[in-house]
Amino acid sequence: MPKYRSHTTTHGRNMAGARALWRATGMTDDDFGKPIIAVVNSFTQFVPGHVHLRDLGKLVAEQIEASGGVAKEFNTIAVDDGIAMGHGGMLYSLPSRELIADSVEYMVNAHCADAMVCISNCDKITPGMLMASLRLNIPVIFVSGGPMEAGKTKLSDKIIKLDLVDAMIQGANPNVSDADSEQIERSACPTCGSCSGMFTANSMNCLNEALGLALPGNGSLLATHADRKQLFLDAGKHIVELTKRYYEQDDISALPRSIANKAAFENAMTLDIAMGGSTNTVLHLLAAAQEGDIDFDISDIDRLSRKVPHLCKVAPSTQKYHMEDVHRAGGVVGILGELDRAGLLNREVKNVLGLNLPQTLEAYDVMLTKDEGVKQMYSAGPAGIRTTKAFSQDCRFPSLDTDRQEGCIRTREHAYSQDGGLAVLYGNLSENGSIVKTAGVDKDSLTFRGPAKVYESQDDAVAAILGGKVVAGDVVVIRYEGPKGGPGMQEMLYPTTYLKSMGLGKSCALLTDGRFSGGTSGLSIGHASPEAASGGLIALVQDGDIIDIDIPNRAMKLDVSDAELAARREAELARGDAAWTPKARERQVSYALRAYALLATSADKGAVRDKSKLGG
């Protein structure tokens, strides 16, 4: 029988000092026999997805204590990618994931906590906490802050739905008036919560539900809706049950590595492909798998991407549907139900409730369930009132979206396309793979051939696009923006956004060893591995070189002879210590970022630390 970790600090005469300190936090004699459960919060006033979390840790803690545990809350950092976007702040976004994972490990191991409830929401916070959970392998339940309501405004006598990306595109579009741009800006992000489309934050919260580590409804139920409160209460209750299952019944199925095993990772990736999730999810799933010693790599993603159809299309790939519409159609479980009926899921997986996939679908799939309470939960809708408060409204859709032919979620037979929403491309430009969000690519751009316009920083590319130096037919190449080369693997949302605002969104391609925001759409290929700073061929591309992109055949090639490439490589190596670094880039890189770059792997490994350099 496993021993409660917390007994290390609460039992034995030699721990009198530790107990004295525990007493100073409010613990009593009765508490020293109970499990100590960390409530890992991420409240901050910097991030709309986290601004409402201040009191939600207390809500979970009260439920933990009512259920027989001792709750101890702490906070992690949280970076808002949208606010950090387009300037040097974006260098810190991906590295913050590792700091979050480390901070959770430090706090939980230093204080010998027995289990965790992770209150996450936005882009790097959920992945960082997921990495820590699989690294620590103690009982855990995730409950996120929930999605933002979609923005809505009236333009040209028509009501339109909006999100953050619309504000960015129209703000840079010279054909949009100042008044309309300001109106869109003021309407795009109306409430607290993670940005309203299938961007990285919502994608990861959906994947956590598919991994089995979050409760049904977690990925799609709006942050503002009163129904979401129950998820926090249930998380506090169930984590105590999960903890006792492991420590008192020796049930290892309660541990995250047992729940989020390889079969669950395959299901999560299958969901991601079917819903056209953010390309960042590939990076984060690969990183989490490494932390949990799970045999899941980019070849698995490639294999799955070739057979999974695109069943759910959401902003930024369309403005018709946002997360509130996914929820109305049945949320994550609704998509999983269609994937299961298509024979595309591993059915033996279990979630934190102890339910296997068929049991979960029977209870929570709106197409199957007879539970009116579940149907009511999935009818939770937006109020359209600006607010930063959680659980502040109880509006409902008049009916669920169960139209699987033309609705938000579709059957395999009526899929948006039989090709999934994500694809892995290989070729001499990305020998270890690159990622494209096919859900956001125009059908006429699935094959593309054009001359390269090469830039050694995102800033130079943005200046060229806005300055009219990029024209229709070009392949914009942005290199030395990978995990090492950036460092920090910046998101390229501004270059892709400005291509759209300049009318080039469907007539240009973009290739980078950096990554993309979940808000990116268009022919945008990222994560080129190996990256330029690691000697990848992307470092040898020159202006005017022809690049061939063939998404149906999962291929991408630099059309330059082997002899010429060998000569270019020799010339690069002749630069000595300056080889595989940008030739002309002004960028201040802090020691914190240099430390990250020193250990960072390329994107095909999840941009995690290179463990071979750490020994042990």
From Swiss-Prot:
<comment type="pathway">
    <text>Amino-acid biosynthesis; L-valine biosynthesis; L-valine from pyruvate: step 3/4.</text>
</comment>
<dbReference type="GO" id="GO:0051537">
    <property type="term" value="F:2 iron, 2 sulfur cluster binding"/>
</dbReference>
<keyword id="KW-0456">Lyase</keyword>
<dbReference type="GO" id="GO:0005829">
    <property type="term" value="C:cytosol"/>
</dbReference>
<feature type="modified residue" description="N6-carboxylysine">
    <location>
        <position position="124"/>
    </location>
</feature>
<dbReference type="InterPro" id="IPR056740">
    <property type="entry name" value="ILV_EDD_C"/>
</dbReference>
<dbReference type="InterPro" id="IPR020558">
    <property type="entry name" value="DiOHA_6PGluconate_deHydtase_CS"/>
</dbReference>
<keyword id="KW-0028">Amino-acid biosynthesis</keyword>
<keyword id="KW-0001">2Fe-2S</keyword>
<dbReference type="GO" id="GO:0009099">
    <property type="term" value="P:L-valine biosynthetic process"/>
</dbReference>
<comment type="function">
    <text>Functions in the biosynthesis of branched-chain amino acids. Catalyzes the dehydration of (2R,3R)-2,3-dihydroxy-3-methylpentanoate (2,3-dihydroxy-3-methylvalerate) into 2-oxo-3-methylpentanoate (2-oxo-3-methylvalerate) and of (2R)-2,3-dihydroxy-3-methylbutanoate (2,3-dihydroxyisovalerate) into 2-oxo-3-methylbutanoate (2-oxoisovalerate), the penultimate precursor to L-isoleucine and L-valine, respectively.</text>
</comment>
<feature type="binding site">
    <location>
        <position position="122"/>
    </location>
    <ligand>
        <name>[2Fe-2S] cluster</name>
    </ligand>
</feature>
<feature type="binding site" description="via carbamate group">
    <location>
        <position position="124"/>
    </location>
    <ligand>
        <name>Mg(2+)</name>
    </ligand>
</feature>
<keyword id="KW-0460">Magnesium</keyword>
<dbReference type="Pfam" id="PF00920">
    <property type="entry name" value="ILVD_EDD_N"/>
</dbReference>
<dbReference type="GO" id="GO:0009097">
    <property type="term" value="P:isoleucine biosynthetic process"/>
</dbReference>
<keyword id="KW-0479">Metal-binding</keyword>
<protein>
    <recommendedName>
        <fullName>Dihydroxy-acid dehydratase</fullName>
        <ecNumber>4.2.1.9</ecNumber>
    </recommendedName>
</protein>
<comment type="subunit">
    <text>Homodimer.</text>
</comment>
<dbReference type="InterPro" id="IPR037237">
    <property type="entry name" value="IlvD/EDD_N"/>
</dbReference>
<dbReference type="InterPro" id="IPR000581">
    <property type="entry name" value="ILV_EDD_N"/>
</dbReference>
<comment type="similarity">
    <text>Belongs to the IlvD/Edd family.</text>
</comment>
<feature type="binding site">
    <location>
        <position position="123"/>
    </location>
    <ligand>
        <name>Mg(2+)</name>
    </ligand>
</feature>
<feature type="active site" description="Proton acceptor">
    <location>
        <position position="517"/>
    </location>
</feature>
<feature type="binding site">
    <location>
        <position position="81"/>
    </location>
    <ligand>
        <name>Mg(2+)</name>
    </ligand>
</feature>
<keyword id="KW-0408">Iron</keyword>
<keyword id="KW-0411">Iron-sulfur</keyword>
<dbReference type="InterPro" id="IPR042096">
    <property type="entry name" value="Dihydro-acid_dehy_C"/>
</dbReference>
<keyword id="KW-0100">Branched-chain amino acid biosynthesis</keyword>
<dbReference type="Pfam" id="PF24877">
    <property type="entry name" value="ILV_EDD_C"/>
</dbReference>
<comment type="pathway">
    <text>Amino-acid biosynthesis; L-isoleucine biosynthesis; L-isoleucine from 2-oxobutanoate: step 3/4.</text>
</comment>
<dbReference type="GO" id="GO:0004160">
    <property type="term" value="F:dihydroxy-acid dehydratase activity"/>
</dbReference>
<feature type="binding site">
    <location>
        <position position="491"/>
    </location>
    <ligand>
        <name>Mg(2+)</name>
    </ligand>
</feature>
<feature type="binding site">
    <location>
        <position position="195"/>
    </location>
    <ligand>
        <name>[2Fe-2S] cluster</name>
    </ligand>
</feature>
<dbReference type="GO" id="GO:0000287">
    <property type="term" value="F:magnesium ion binding"/>
</dbReference>
<dbReference type="InterPro" id="IPR004404">
    <property type="entry name" value="DihydroxyA_deHydtase"/>
</dbReference>
